């Protein structure tokens, strides 16, 4: 057997091992991603019909606000992470909606587990014009859910959760936004 034939056989064998390794890795990763123990629904602590837990949050403008101080108003409470691609897409869409028409309800976004500086950079990047706060230790977020962002909670004037969405979906975002507009008329 010539050197070239031996080389080609080794090359093909190596390629097969690499392909099989990648395939096996993909199967393992798919199993982790689809782990039924961590579905968005199972990680939700506050559901439609529940009273939204009160909290105090520090806003990027330096002031603080409480959810209870917004009692009587319709509130869209958004939990997000600045590094989450779905959150970035959602904020780009929300800011586009807000630029077309100022919402008739209160929008309050809270970054989960991030610093004021990181959240300010994100807010500036997306040109966010509504209130944004930070929850660096996740103490607020952990009262509402255990995993997954973005999460949008539509809270009615009585403090009850009227609707919620988990992760970014264009149609769901527009549906909950429209419901907030209808409720605040």
What does each model-identified segment do?
Residues 1-52, 172-181, 185:
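N-terminal targeting signals for export/organelle localization
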Residues 52-53, 75, 149-151:
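Short loop/turn microsegments at loop-to-beta-strand junctions
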């Amino acid at each position: 057997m010539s050197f070239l034939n031996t080389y080609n056989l080794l090359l093909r064998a190596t390629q097969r091992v690499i392909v099989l390794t990648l395939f096996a890795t993909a199967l393992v990763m798919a199993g982790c991603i689809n782990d039924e123990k961590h579905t968005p629904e199972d990680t939700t602590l506050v559901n439609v019909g529940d009273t939204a837990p009160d909290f105090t949050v520090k806003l990027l403008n330096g002031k603080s606000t409480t959810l209870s101080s917004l009692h009587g108003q319709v509130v869209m409470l958004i939990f997000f992470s600045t590094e989450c691609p779905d959150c970035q897409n959602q904020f780009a869409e929300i800011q586009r909606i807000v630029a077309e028409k100022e919402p008739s309800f209160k929008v309050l976004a809270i970054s989960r587990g991030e610093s004021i500086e990181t959240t300010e950079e994100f807010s500036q990047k997306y040109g966010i014009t509504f209130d944004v706060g930070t929850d660096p230790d996740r103490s607020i977020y952990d009262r509402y859910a255990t995993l997954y962002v973005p999460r949008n909670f539509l809270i009615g004037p009585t403090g009850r959760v009227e609707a919620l969405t988990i992760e970014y979906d264009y149609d769901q975002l527009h549906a909950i936004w429209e419901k907030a507009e209808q409720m605040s008329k």
